[in-house]
Amino acid sequence: MSIRIGILGYGNLGRGVECAIKHNPDLELVAVFTRRAPETVKILTETAAVYSVNDAEKMKDKIDVLIICGGSATDLPKQTPEYAKMFNVIDSFDTHARIPEHFDAVDAAAKESGHIGIISVGWDPGMFSLNRLYANAILTNGKDYTFWGKGVSQGHSDAVRRIDRKSVV
């Protein structure tokens, strides 16, 4: 029996998640949910369908895990707690300073509905944080550095998407 996966958001991250699912035979992509017109979204998985985000609740008994692939600035703070009420969820929330409040919101929604919410899974925090942990375990007297802070390395993609192209030209 495979784990049935849904993807919410089909930008670069959503497409990457779909490709990763294809490499894992114990995972099955069931649905992709989008805010765009579903018929305009072309996915690689022939056995999965594309739906409007408005139809996600109808699929709550057909999906084991919903991977939420939105932006940390505005999407994930709203979407992850909302969908944790219906699904087990995973997101890649990466605004370090707001992780505690995001955790609290997702945790409360997931506990209330009997679901599991896993947040901040990605590069940093995530794989980059694990690499730092491994290095600290080996180099016990070493000093590690991190390069995030106010206005640094937080939401670059989200900020770039909000640039008005007309004002740049």
Where are the regions that the model predicts?
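Active-site-lining helix/loop region of Rossmann-like oxidoreductase modules
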Residues: 2-8, 12, 16, 134-169
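Short alpha-helices
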Residues: 115-136
